Amino acid sequence: MKEIRIHARAGQGAITTARILAMAAFEQGRYALAFPHFGAERMGAPMNAFVRLDDSKVQLRSRVHAPDYILVVDPSLAASSDFGVFDGLKPDGLAIINYAGDVDTLAGMTKAKIVTVPASEIALEILGQDRANVPLLGAFAAATGEVKIEALEKAIVQNFGEVKVATKNVEAVRRAYEMVAGQALTAKR
């Protein structure tokens, strides 16, 4: 089983991200479970969503404490140890972060590999608003191979429904996928 933890602020689309990722895995014949965790948070408060992917039925329904992968929608969460973004991330795990800067500035935060993608910039350019969550899914597909880009695209169309919205989101996910597919995955220690 592969476990994924998504870090974002309320209103940044973490729940949508988890749902689309689970839909894409299901499209490929895998089992998936996606769910959020938040309390009485208001818009902008840190929150998490979780996804479990497996080739057999997913029974475990607790929060993910030792993820194989983390996705960070809001880079300010990764920049502070207060939010525990890297807590429990497996040493051979992977952090995919919405970040336009140099990955070396994040290297001391975890022993796991880090991949960055300027998801906010991609979203602003293509969608006209900072919806970094969907481009991060493209980065996830390219960096991990856990879901195929075609399955993600289909899940996006199913999730958003409206052709114009879905088409732009597919373009954003594809752009991030292509950017990350060109990066070498080297451990930053």
Language-model features, listed with the residues they occupy:
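Active-site cofactor/cluster-binding pocket
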Residues: 1-189
